[in-house]
Amino acid sequence: MDGKEKKSGSKRGSKVFQFDDDADDDEPIGSLLEIMKHKSSKKDKVETESTGKQRQKQVVEKKLSALGKDSEDMDDTLASFRKRLKGNKKGVESGTSRVRNHEGVDTVTNSNLKPIEEANKNEVQSVLLRENGASNSIQKCASETGTLLHKFSGKDKAASPSHEKVETVSSEKEADVFHQITKEESEIPMSEKAVELSRVSVPMPDVHGEVNCTIAPDKHIHLGEPTSESGYYREKNLVMCDCGTQFNFEDRSFESNTQVTLCQKCKYSSHHNASNGGGIQVNTLEDGTAQASPVSIIPCEDENFRGDAISLPNSGKPSTLQRPERIAKKRKLGNMVYEGDVKWENEQGFLDCQSDKSFKGSDKCGFVPSISKEIEIGRAAAVTAGLKAQSVSPIEKIILKEVLKRKGSNQEYLVCRNSILGLWSKNVSRILPVTECGVTGGPSESELPSASLIREVYKFLDQRGYINAGISSVNGKAASSTNQDYDLLQGRQLEESSMASVADSEEGVAFILGQVKAVESTSEGKKCALQNDERDLVGCATSEMLESISKKCEASIIDDNKRSVSMNALQDSTASNVEKHPETFSVAKPALSSTLSSAHSNQMRGRDCVPCEVIDEKKVIVIGAGPAGLTAARHLQRQGFSVTVLEARSRVGGRVFTDRSSLSVPVDLGASIITGIEADVPSERMPDPSVLVCNQLGLELSVLHGFCPLYDTVTGKKVPAELDDALQAEFNSLIDDVDLLVEEIGKERANKMSLEDGLEYGLQRLRMPHDKVNIDKFGLLNSSSKTGIRGPFMQDESWKDDFLNPLERRVMNWHFAHTEYGCAAVLKEVSLPHWNQDEFYGGFGGPHAMIKGGYSRVVESLAEGLDIHLNKIVSDVSYVSDVSAMDNSKHKVRVSTSNGCEYLGDAVLVTVPLGCLKAETIKFSPPLPDWKYASIKQLGFGVLNKVVLEFPTVFWDDSVDYFGATAEETDLRGECFMFWNVKKTVGAPVLIALVVGKAAFEYTNKSKSEHVNHAMMVLRKLFGGDLVPDPVASVVTDWGTDPYSYGAYSYVAIGASGEDYDVLGRPVQNCLFFAGEATCKEHPDTVGGAMMTGVREAVRIIDILRSGNDYTAEIETLEKAQRKSVPVRDEVRDLIKRLEVVELSNVLARQSLLRNMFFSAKTTVGRLHLAKELLNLPGETLKSFAGTKEGLAVLNSWILDSMGKNGTQLLRHCVHILVRVTSDLFALRLSGIGKTVKEKVCAHTSRDIRAIASQLVNVWLDLYRKEKANSGKKSLRQANTTNTSRIRRKLNSPDTDSKGKLSNGNDVKTDEEFEDNQLPMSEEEKAVFAEAEAARAAAEAAAKAFSEAYHNTSLQLPKIPSFHKFARREQYAKMDESDFRKKFPGNVLGRQDCMSEIDSRNCKVRDWYDFPASCLDLDSARIPVDNYSQPSHSNELVSHSKFRECSGESVAADTSFLTGAWVDTGGSSDGFKDSQAIDRWQSQAAAADPEFFNRTLHIKDEEDSIACSTGPPSWKHDQRANECSVSQVTVNKEPHKNHIRSADRLKQGVVDFVASLLMAPYRAKKIDRDVYKSIMKKTATKVMQHTTDVEKAMAVTQFLDSKRKNKIRDFVDKQVDKYMVIPQVPKP
């Protein structure tokens, strides 16, 4: 252009064809096309000549689309076609074109065009983008016009039509394009000149149609249909296409050559030539629906042709040629995988193709992601969303049955689904649009086959609440790249008012292109008309958002007299609040306090009953603003429904309530615990849904630890650990044997028994002779009630004392009370067979946690943007019961409140607590069906209360999260039985006492002060009256008498079952729906369960109101059938019967039967029964099948499945089995059970589980030592293959011969002991053994000399090790197995949390503590301990030579480190030390200590080296020093010590203990060296500052008792939390 345009050629990948000059002009076009269709190898060229005048010759690719014209036109010759193309030259130059808008088609001439400068800013204009210039206006693609833009010739001037017309300009010349994507970003200066719009060729096989580009107003443009109810807005200087892709030319720079910005979704392209003044050419191609289009016949070598409607200029008038469509079978491209192909999921990269990439003519993305990482992210995201990671759930089978029934579609679907879920999990705070998944918002004929699958999966995930859930919004905390190129709603204060979400299409995709600005009221039938002169806002908002804005609302007020009046609601500038309309959702999101206070304020002003109607908008009324109601309302509103929430309280949240006024800090008086914060992918357990909102808000969680010390109120001391562990194991066994008891006594009888009866019966069977245990005493005289416990057994407890002493009874009662806390009911009222029916679902994954700042922050965030009416006590709900009447009725439900207001809607969702339904506070008309009332009556609703105490200081053990207290009386066992230490959560000394069971039901019999006094009495008994100050503030709850809850949460009462949860949640007449925790059988009594039911019912309402199908009911039926297919108790009965059959047969038959059942057991109860039988088998028999790789894999699956609720007993038995069958470390590694034990079992909350795990680790370590000893000998046999040249060289050495004679016999003898079946050794092998033995003998002699010389040296004072050495300590701690030789009693662990009870009996516990952290990875292909001595030879010797400096209690180092590290065979990559390594070690040892070879070393055997004492000989029999440090080096105490040395010794003990705590985060690189040193210094200094002279004289273990260790651990944890950098959750 301007005579300076460079030649442009077709780049690789483009498919632009050119007619040859010598083509036969008389040849029919159809035959010509047929010939060109098969000339795929021919390369066409486009040449551009620069002369005095602009000349361009370009052939543009375009598929022909038939619109109804006969096929005769294809017989036109090329000559006639060229003649018609030329037409009237004057008409072309004058820019005559044909224009079509949504109202009609008009012809526009030059006289009708106006310059851009004169155009009205508020009109939709069309601009001609000319060369050497750019437009400063916004460009918009509107496919509805169906027109094309073409380039004017250089003589034409910029002009624009009126806003009612869209101009189409054609040109004789067309320009080619380069298929190159711009990658750099910068600003393009926009001039006043118009930028020329030109149609460009996009060489894509699925290119289709055209998109009209117009200019929008200066501020905003409207996308979508002209009559759309929702408008979308974008900042100026944006070019947008129909698929939702935006191009911001203001922020993008173009390279010096011609480039194209290509929309991968709809093939929208923008062409720019920087060499000509930055002109931008924009074009998109769509399906052939346009009635005005130029002829462009460009065949794709692998595609078929379609005819397009063409518009030809003829004497200044547009003409249209409609050509028939030629339909032929598509040929598959060789480089593409189509829908249904097996490799579809492997080549699908649609979710990773979000950035600009070079286009090479293929639809596949050029980005190859990290497959394994993306797959893991997708699977974790699927589990987090509540789906299965690698299989299809029942809901997917029902909804997507058409998609899944194709061959190979399951795997394709899973890949697609997990990819979309993983994409959203990377930023859960924003709404993921479908366009970011690589497809357009709507289907098209020429899109990839996978696009329909992606769109269908996205629609399913979005509508079912698996993505874009919680409080996600368009403007998330970290917006995606597609949302960073522009600002939404320029000029608006988004931080003050963000717009609500509205579904923009039936695809269920909201906010793909932008935020909703207004809901256009184009229909005259709408009764609510809102007038706003300045802004088009919808709904009624608070005065903060409607200042100086007047509005008029005409609506029908429904009152007691059923009068209809017209009301003008004018905004008063002095008014503080304005009531929101109940039947329109609020568009704005003001502060929650303002939103809620507005409803209360206007209720007092009598303006609270103004329902507004919008035609064709479904209205849903939600009763209750708890977690379930808010979650449902939010999902319904985002899907385009009008939602009104009615709440009886003056606040939102329901039973979630954070008190911010009674104490100095906010405290949760209702729900307070998130019952699972992490997705457990192996067991497919999702986290609590409230965690999603916490992540979206960035809330900080306080993770709870499982250790709960138990105090006895009678003695005022801790319950002995041995007794506590024994009784806890006994109680867990009783709980797990409940299912067996049910099978034993029969279901009919068991259904009439309570859980307490079953536990007492099981306890008697364990403690009493069988002839004295009578089941008839249980369950017959019982009578449950709603208020407390009834029956003779709670009145007379003397019969229980026959087999339990008083202390045991108090401890057992505490465990009973803890179970009552889980059920919120007395055990006498809980069903025996169904009390834990939710165990089948496993609960939520991850540890429990509390929210800093309170749980109300979650529900308050859910309430933002919703139309909530507070203080609305619902009294009556009327619904249409007749189906025929329902079809004729405009409104199906009517909700009335106590103040006379009524609300009409299409559906009502009842989320009130079960206690309110039991109390019948809401009257239903007609009454609820009998089956609904039966479930309401049968299910139980329990009570849990709290006594919150705030103290001036902390007097309890602040390192624990909770502690228990026994009760003297059985009836009062649940009163203040547990105290929650919430100091680290709330930041103040606060304890929360729990009141459950009978004490909670009799709660009202005492006053608030009496409850506080009782809690204080218990605390003073536990900690001493003088140490417990009076509380500075207190709060007492009483949920049982709350008129809006009547309790805490639900439980399965006697006579009920888990199916009652489903029955309670079923809808009535498809217009009355129920949600809440009492309708969630999977997760009852949890906030997460309530939120899940809210989404469930919202989805059900959407399905019924839109399609009339209740897919949720189908899912429940399918799941019920699946549960019956694997009946729990039927499997137990089958196991028992089969074992009874072979009881009298031979032993081998029984063992074979157990083996078969071991590999086929499916249920937890069946596995538990089988595990008990397996433990009775002989060890070798059990090891023969359970110790193999397959058997260990089965045990691994059992352990993973037992990590859910109430699986402790099965887990305990599995670990016992592992202790007995472990004999092959290789099989252990291959099965994956080592990792499971390390990550799951070692971190288990149960103390007895950790104690058993310690025994298992001992077994593994012993087995490892034996295997290593054997491998050392066997590895020497292989040395000749790698060191042949070196061996031959040394064979000729006389030293080698002599060394061989010294030890060859011993070596052979040792080899024969371990390898009886080995072949005779060759001469070279013997030489290797001789060399190694010689080196060993020399090293032992040197070590012995060093040891004897060291004994004679004067003792030195211990030195406080430098922190640099402590940071390096892990090197010599890893050198060999000497650290692992230190055994510890297996029954010591379990007193406290792994490291809490380190005393003289378990001083070797460091081995156990380090093992799960990083010392032994049993899943690796090699045991990494073999490699621990490899990293640095020099560092190893320095560490060993100065090892005594690193021991806080020693004056003489344990010489086993010296002999074990290099003398023993092991530690190299091949499992042995060669002579070079030994020589190197000797030279380094001599360099470190010149007297090394002049000393004698006292060598002890392996077991003695575990605790060897290297002090002076005269002290040989002195008592061994107490050890509690990381070094674990044993020393003899000196007879004379001063306070300085004692202080150093204590300080060293503290340093060692702190090092043990910091080693794990340091090795995990969560803290660096500086933080390590800083925490070490601070901790040691603080501890020693508070140490008295009397304490300095104590032994280390006496000084570091459990209480002091807990304080140190808590201090270290706080320091680590302070310094550790917490990574952002991708969410995960």
Swiss-Prot record:
Describe the location of the SWIRM domain by residue ranges. 378-478
Q: Where is the composition biased (Basic and acidic residues)?
A: 43-64
Family of the protein in this entry: Belongs to the flavin monoamine oxidase family.
Sorted UniProt keywords: Chromatin regulator, FAD, Flavoprotein, Oxidoreductase, Repressor, Transcription, Transcription regulation
Q: What is this protein called?
A: Lysine-specific histone demethylase 1 homolog 3
EC number(s) per UniProt?
1.-.-.-
Segments for region (Disordered): 1-71, 1271-1317
Bias (Acidic residues): 19-28
